[in-house]
């Protein structure tokens, strides 16, 4: 069996967005499952809109997602000689011809066809000419492909099944502009055949290009690759996903605290499923994903579901993995994890509740930095008359503990509740506010164990003093 070769071919006119990332993921999974090769090609022929910054953003996004490629990146702007050679091959074989029609003539033709409620298409005026016509001659002729006038093209699509196109519905495609630069439909065919691509997986907005490209493959003497056109992604309003729905850069999801494996998990489920299973690891996806099982219907992007999946992956991941991703978020907040509790230990206390790494970073700050103030609502609810005495009692007991561990700390909290004849919460909550500045933290015994005896005693004493000055 021929080795499977797929490609991801983004245009560097913007960031790597959700739709592009899903296409790349489907191609990558299909390749990895079958032990093939994944090729990265940058389609940068639009010189006005293509930027180095966009290329870097695409490469960075793929690296963050872990979508490694085996060959490339190849750049179309470095391949013009190859395109010119294949253009000449088609011209020499009579499969392509020069079209001298002016823009004005083509616009008049379009207007007349629309007035007759006909599909706008080239009328073949220059198709059988040996040279320029006698009038209305363009300064720079384009090159058109000589599309068969009769018959049909069948696209055997892995997702949509058999799709048939009548040749009579296809006009003679422009494959090179007046300045000699090749057009998209031509370059993509040349690239795919020269790079040995066997399976083209792309968005279904390219389906209508496929019969034209199949003609080009055949004219150049090559078998077309297999095709799979994945359905579009919709916003929750049923319209095509765009920036207004949150169709943002993949890297923005990174910056908002999503794990790459969570985003991959969500993207693969936008069109594919495996029974009722919701949460998948990347290795598991490589084993299970089948491009033939992708649904042909459009999928709806649901930010809440993505966040839920992110929480699931945070809960299930190894603490050292989370710590590697969490470190940069703490650094952004001016925190050096080396100057406090072990980051993996902090992660363990947060994994059950954090929805994003941003949330986890914000909730972890107090482990490395004393609170500058107490949240007003938390202080009002938990710092009451008599709280100072409870805090001072705990402070004294903490100082004298023979060992500093969660069990011993829990014993102090229990003993204090009994000594002051209050419920456990009347001790634990003031302690929580005292050390974290808020009423929300991991279990108090685990929290204090991580903070350490010296820091705990200092913060509890500081809070007791604050209560005496502000509450009484």
Swiss-Prot record:
CDD domains: GluRS_core. Its cofactor is Zn(2+). Gene3D superfamilies: 1.10.10.350, HUPs (3.40.50.620). Zn(2+) binds at residues 99, 101, 126, 128. It catalyses: tRNA(Glu) + L-glutamate + ATP = L-glutamyl-tRNA(Glu) + AMP + diphosphate. It is found in: Cytoplasm. A motif ('HIGH' region) lies at residues 10-20. ATP binds at residue 243. Binds 1 zinc ion per subunit. Its main location: cytoplasm. GO terms for cellular component: cytosol. Residues 112-130 have a biased composition (Basic and acidic residues). Catalyzes the attachment of glutamate to tRNA(Glu) in a two-step reaction: glutamate is first activated by ATP to form Glu-AMP and then transferred to the acceptor end of tRNA(Glu). Monomer. This is Glutamate--tRNA ligase 2. It comes from Halorhodospira halophila (strain DSM 244 / SL1). The gene is gltX2.
